[in-house]
Amino acid sequence: MSPNVEVEPTLDDRDIAAGSEVVGAPVGRSARRGTGQMALIVATVVALAGYALSIFARTPCISNGFNGIGRYTHLCYSDIPVLYSLRGFADGRLPYLDHIPGQQGFEYPVLTGAFAQIGAWLTPIFGGGGIGFYAANVLLLGICFLVTVLATGAAARPRNWDAVLLASAPALLVAATINWDLLAVALTAVWLLLWSRKLPGWAGVVLGLAIAAKFYPLVLCGPMLLLCLRSARMSAFWRMMGTAALAWLAVNVPVMIMNSPTKPFVPGSPTLAIVATMNSAA
C-alpha cells in the first residue's frame, strides 16, 4: 500500500470493525480515501479533550492547593506544585546551581530542570504560587503531549489512525501531569519520527536531548540496535548514537562546569553524578 494512503482501521482490524457498528459500521469499500491528514486532526481533537479531562480530574487537588490527604484519595497528586517551594523555584533559585541549605537539589535530569525553570518564569502570568507554577507547566506539558501525538501519527504512516490510540490512552487521565515525563515522551516521539524519515544525524540530536530529559529513552536503543543489525543499518545507528552523545554533552557539560568543585555539590539528578566524584576528589 502507498505510504500516502492511510490504512482504514475498520477495514484492517476485525475487532475495530465489530466495535464500529455502534457508531455507524465500517467504512464502505467504495468510500473516498484520505491521505492521513484527517487522522491527525481527529487525534489532535481527541488529545486536547483527553488532556482537558485529565486536568479536570485534578480539580479536588487544585481547589485545596495540592495539600492534605485528598491528593492521594482523589488520585490527583502531582510533584509539580510540591517541588515549587521544596526545590527553590519559589525563591528564584536555579536548579543544580543554587544550593538550598538543608534541602535536596532538583532530582530530575538537566533538560527537565530547564523545562521546569521555564515554567517558573511563566508562573507570575498564572497568578504565582504553587498553583500558578502547576498551571504554567500544564500549558507546557500540553504542548509536549500534542507533539507526541502528531509525531507518532506522522511516523506511523500509513497507519496514521494509530495516533488516536495514544491520544485516548487511559493512562493520560492519571499520569499526564504527575511530573515532567511528557517532555521526554515528546522528544522520544520526535526522535522516532526523524529516524523513520532516514535522518539519523538529527534523530541522534533529539535522542540526546530526550536522554538529557529522562533516562528511559536510552533503554530503547537496545531494540533499535537489534533492528539495525537485522536490516544492515549499523552505519546509521552509530551516526545516530554519536550525535546523541554530542547533544547530551552539550546540555550537561555547561551545568557540570558551572557546578564546579569550588561550589558545594547539590544532590539531585543522576546526570550530575560525575560532579560528585569531582568534588570528592578535589
Label every model-predicted segment.
Residues 237-282:
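Membrane-lumen/periplasm interface segments of specific transmembrane helices
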Residues 194-209, 242:
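Short hydrophobic alpha-helices at membrane interfaces in multi-pass membrane enzymes
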Residues 2-156:
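TM-lumen/periplasm interface segments of multi-pass membrane proteins
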Residues 176-184:
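Short acidic/glycine- and proline-prone juxtamembrane loop motifs at membrane-interface regions
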Residues 219-246:
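Perimembrane helix-loop-helix junctions
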Residues 150-169:
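Transmembrane-helix signature of polytopic, membrane-embedded enzymes
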Residues 151, 184-199:
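Specific aromatic-rich, kink-prone transmembrane helix
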Residues 205-227, 250:
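Transmembrane helices and adjacent periplasmic/lumenal helix-loop junctions
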